[in-house]
């Protein structure tokens, strides 16, 4: 009949496991040094992980603030667009140029009518005065 561990915990044996020799003081020292080295490495790893987590949290907070600022700017620009669209609609009702039967008004004579499309300057000789959709 085998005996289990005592009521308070683990059964300890002074006999080495089969195939193992009893621990020498030199082996004990190595084991202690290895455990200490492992403990220090684990502390370093946990500290590094905590620092990385803190950095990500700070970056998240910063991005949330930037996002909030950009959303407010978008709302402001949408309101400005709505206001300008309304102003344009009101202006179109009264603009004499839009009531004219011609949709194009020449701003200046075209001095370079012979230019090809790739030679022409960036500014057009004609401007469309119709409504934009």
Curated annotation (Swiss-Prot):
Biased composition (Polar residues): 11-24
UniProt-listed GO biological process terms: dendritic cell differentiation; myeloid dendritic cell differentiation; negative regulation of transcription by RNA polymerase II; regulation of transcription by RNA polymerase II; response to virus
Alphabetic keyword roster: Activator, DNA-binding, Nucleus, Phosphoprotein, Repressor, Transcription, Transcription regulation
Tissue specificity as recorded in UniProt: Ubiquitously expressed.
Subcellular location field: Nucleus
UniProt biased composition (Basic and acidic residues): 51-68
Entry-linked SUPFAM superfamilies: Leucine zipper domain (SSF57959)
Gene3D superfamilies hit by this protein: 1.20.5.170
Modified residues (Phosphoserine): 2, 24
Cross-referenced Pfam families: bZIP_2
Region Basic motif, annotated ranges: 30-55
Cellular component aspect of the GO annotation: nucleus; RNA polymerase II transcription regulator complex
Alphabetical list of InterPro entries matching this protein: AP-1 (IPR000837), bZIP (IPR004827), bZIP_sf (IPR046347)
Transmembrane segments: none
Assembly and interaction partners: Heterodimer; heterodimerizes with JUN family proteins. Interacts with JUN.
Function (record text): AP-1 family transcription factor that controls the differentiation of CD8(+) thymic conventional dendritic cells in the immune system. Acts via the formation of a heterodimer with JUN family proteins that recognizes and binds DNA sequence 5'-TGA[CG]TCA-3' and regulates expression of target genes. Required for development of CD8-alpha(+) classical dendritic cells (cDCs) and related CD103(+) dendritic cells that cross-present antigens to CD8 T-cells and produce interleukin-12 (IL12) in response to pathogens.
Family membership: Belongs to the bZIP family.
Protein name: Basic leucine zipper transcriptional factor ATF-like 3
Organism, as annotated: Rattus norvegicus
Lineage of source species: Eukaryota, Metazoa, Chordata, Craniata, Vertebrata
